[in-house]
Each structure stands twice: as structure tokens, then as C-alpha cells.
Amino acid sequence: MSKLSLSSLDKTHLEGKKVLVRVDFNVPLNEDGQITDDTRIRAAIPTIEYLINHSAKVILAAHFGRPKGQVNEKMRLTPVAARLSELLGQNVALTNSCIGDEAIAQSNSLSNGDVLLLENVRFFGEEEKNDLEFAKKLASHADMYINDAFGAAHRAHASTQGVTNYLSPSVAGFLLEKELKYLQGAIDSPKRPLAAIVGGSKVSSKIGVLDSLLDKCDKIMIGGGMIFTFYKARGLDVGKSLVEEDKLKLAKDLEAKAKAKGVELLLPTDVVLADEFSPDANSKISRIDSISGNWMGLDIGPDSIKVFQNALAECKTIIWNGPMGVFEFDKFAEGTNAIATTLADLSAFSEVCTIIGGGDSVAAVEKAGLAEKMSHISTGGGASLELLEGKTLPGVAALNDA
């Protein structure tokens, strides 16, 4: 799906223009209201700086948290405006509301190169309902629209889809363009062999992805809590490990489909067991056919790590979505950390394209200090999953075609 992007617009298109940019500033805060991870803010900087340098008037729209259509003082974008001001080295004003006469007066008074952040669009319930009247009010701030919020592109909301009815051109920002290039590219025209590593605790949340990847991948490695549903489906004892009883048939069907399609589906052969779900639990390594009693699996074992590493060494494109174990507990983080290190090395030394597809895998890679070594780290959890499932993202579909 080829969409117009900011890179196709120059100063003649942008100078003096009021540009509404949808960004993803949904960042984590601590109890003191301070930002603990500004990755998403930094990810939007290239688009914002390009607009500043091309003398546009920049109006940013973002959501924060789930205020349920009401003003919530704890969900104001004040800390975001402060951090963005620091990163840009210039003042970023924040409106009291994203729509209304006062906000419009602020956007109308901008000079070329100024940046204005509209207050949390989700303070209005109309945002998530994709209400066109509300979208029209948002659009009235600007002459044109840029979507740079990949993390919200799978939502058909007023600020991601509705506004495109009233602003033209509507184009992709640099971040959105990069996300589509890597994720869409990995699915549509990857360098092969193509491998996917799929982890996480539940098969149910990854059904669509696994099903879609079976049509595209040469190898699929499965880790995380979901492996125990596959083992139970094979008739193995999994002790107290997490199992989705209603997904046993599905797990069997996925294994059968992989076999029929000639896709190499790798499941761990050994696991790290714990006697309780706790960072201080007693642990032991066990083959998958020797799990019993009150033990539960919380990570993949050392033999499985080696098998996965050997399989990955043959690949040219690797997509990773979901951790291999409970990486938040250091005792059960070895599988996830080993995969992260392997991907970083393959990316650095073998020119393998490594894509970290959002969510917990990103947190794991950042915790390991390896984010910079990957080819691409996706900023969207749900959005990257839906793209990998082959779904159309409403926020992308709404943009002007190239």
C-alpha cells in the first residue's frame, strides 16, 4: 500500500502552512508524574524537526492513557510538552483543550517554525467514536495533515482517520513511513529465509499472527507461556504451567498447517521450571516430557536456545514478537536475553534484517541495552501485530495514495 509521505513534500508545500501532526506520545509516567521512557517522543522528532526547518507551523495531536472521554488532570500532556521542549531546544506551548475558540486562537497565532501541542484528544469521547463533527473541529486548526502515530494507526479514531476527510494532503510522517517500510517489506518482499520468533503468554493473542505468518515464513520459533498449550495438545504433562484449555485444538491445527506448508515450526525441547510464580522461586531445567507436579515453566531452556540460535543463523530476515519467558524476573530472562543478543549479533555482523515487532519484545531488547543494534524497533504493539496479520490499518488507509 503506497501512500504519500512527508519526504515527498518540500519547502514550497510547507512554508507558512499549519500542519496537524498526529503523534504517539502515550508514554509511561512514574507516581510523581515524570516520564520514565521517552522513546515515543524521540521517535517523532525527525518529522517535527523537518517541519520546523521547512518553516511550517506545527500543531501536534496526541492521546495519553484512557481518560474515558473526560478531563483527567493526571492525564494532561504537561510533562510531554516539557520533555518535547527540551528535545527540540525550543518552547512547545500546550493548549488547555484540543478544540474550541481558545485553542484555535493559539494555532492561528503561530509563527513559522513554532510548535503547539494540543491537549489530550481522548478528553473527548468523540475521539474514539471517530465522530466527524469532532474531527472537523480538530481539522480546523490546520491546512494539511500528517499521521506519524504508528502506535495508533490501527484505530479508526477522529484524529487518525476522521480528520483526513477535511485536510488535504494527508500524508505519512517519517516514523510511520519507516514502520511500513520494514514491517510491510518483511511480509511482502523479505530477503529469505524469513523467520518469525513468536512469544508471549497466550496463544489466543497471537492466533492471527501465527496463522498469517505460516503463509509467509520459512521458519517459526515459538516461546513464552503459549508453548504449554502446544505441549498439552500433544498429550504431555505440563504441571502447573499456563495452558489455554479452549485453544488445544487450535494449537494442534497450527502444527498440522505448518507441516502441510513445509514451514519449520520449532518449539523448545527443554524449559526452565519454577515452583512458584516469583522472582525468587526455586528453579530447575527440565526436558519437556519430564514436567510434573507443582512445577511451572517460566522460560525456555539452554538446549532450546542453541537450537533456536542455529536456526536463526541461516536466516536473512527475522521478525520477533513476544518474549521467550518471564523476562521481568532475572532468573527467567535468559531465553529472552539470548534471543536479543543473537539478533543483535546477526544484525551487526551478518547483515540480517532484524525487526522487533512491538510490545514486550521492545521492552526486553531495551532492558538488555541492545535496541540500537537492531535494524528496526517498532513503536506499535497492537498496530504491528495487525500489520503482521495482514490487516489494513485504518490510519494508513485514510492517507492520500502516492
UniProtKB/Swiss-Prot annotation:
Molecular function (Gene Ontology), one example: phosphoglycerate kinase activity
Amino acids binding ATP: 206, 297, 328, 358-361
Recorded GO CC terms: cytosol
Pathway entry: Carbohydrate degradation; glycolysis; pyruvate from D-glyceraldehyde 3-phosphate: step 2/5
Catalytically driven reaction(s): (2R)-3-phosphoglycerate + ATP = (2R)-3-phospho-glyceroyl phosphate + ADP
Binding residues for substrate: 24-26, 40, 63-66, 122, 155
Record bears the keyword Kinase: yes
Record's subcellular location: Cytoplasm
InterPro entries xrefs: Phosphoglycerate_kinase (IPR001576), Phosphoglycerate_kinase_CS (IPR015911), Phosphoglycerate_kinase_N (IPR015824), Phosphoglycerate_kinase_sf (IPR036043)
Gene3D superfamilies: Phosphoglycerate kinase, N-terminal domain
Name this polypeptide is given: Phosphoglycerate kinase
Native organism taxonomy: Bacteria, Bacillati, Cyanobacteriota, Cyanophyceae, Synechococcales
Subunit structure, as described in the record: Monomer.
Keyword Plastid: no
Protein family: Belongs to the phosphoglycerate kinase family.
Enzyme Commission number(s): 2.7.2.3
HAMAP family, per database record: Phosphoglyc_kinase (MF_00145)
Native source organism of the sequence: Prochlorococcus marinus (strain MIT 9215)
One matching Pfam family: PGK
GO biological process: gluconeogenesis; glycolytic process
Keywords recorded for this protein, A-Z: ATP-binding, Cytoplasm, Glycolysis, Kinase, Nucleotide-binding, Transferase
